[in-house]
Regions:
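Left-handed beta-helix
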Residues: 39, 44-45, 49-51, 55-56, ...
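Terminal amphipathic alpha-helical/low-complexity segments used for targeting or macromolecular assembly
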Residues: 1-39, 137, 143-146
Length: 146
């Protein structure tokens, strides 16, 4: 809802509607910030798909996640220093992200991938069902490695 309201506010030509929408965004922001402090989770206004599960605290998501992704805790998903909204990770559906895994930059993770605990992902993995691990992250099984 937050993303929708931001889009609605930015595209509105009616000043009153725009101010009302801005007020709604502020209320949602307050609720979100209180919940973030309580649960130790930060999800920025990008896109989280349906059924996303966060198993343990300390998760920061600043990117796009598909449906049914699992975060096991202490995860950082975000952009590099640029701060551009387009330089964020795009994670497919049904991706399992292990404890302490970090995904940084404008990378794409295909559907049904598994990212191992502590992996640092800085490049794209476009083969569905790939198991990814290591620092820097590498494919450790899948179609390419048999």
């Amino acid at each position: 809802k937050y993303e929708y309201l931001c889009f609605k506010r930015d595209s509105s030509k009616n000043a009153i509607k725009s101010k009302l929408t801005s007020f709604q965004i502020k209320l949602i922001d307050i609720k979100k910030n209180n919940l973030s402090l309580k649960l130790d989770i930060e999800i920025n206004p990008f896109h989280c798909g349906k059924g996303v599960r966060i198993c343990h605290p300390n998760v920061i998501i600043n990117g796009y996640t598909g449906d049914n992704c699992i975060f096991h805790g202490n995860n950082v998903i975000g952009n590099k220093k640029t701060g551009a909204k387009t330089d964020v990770p795009k994670i497919g559906n049904n991706v399992d992200i292990g404890t302490g895994a970090i995904i940084i930059g404008d990378v794409v993770i295909a559907d049904n991938c598994v990212i191992g605990a502590g992996a640092v992902v800085t490049k794209a993995f476009t083969t569905p069902g790939t198991v990814i691990a290591g620092i820097p992250a590498k494919e450790i099984n899948g179609e390419n490695n048999g």
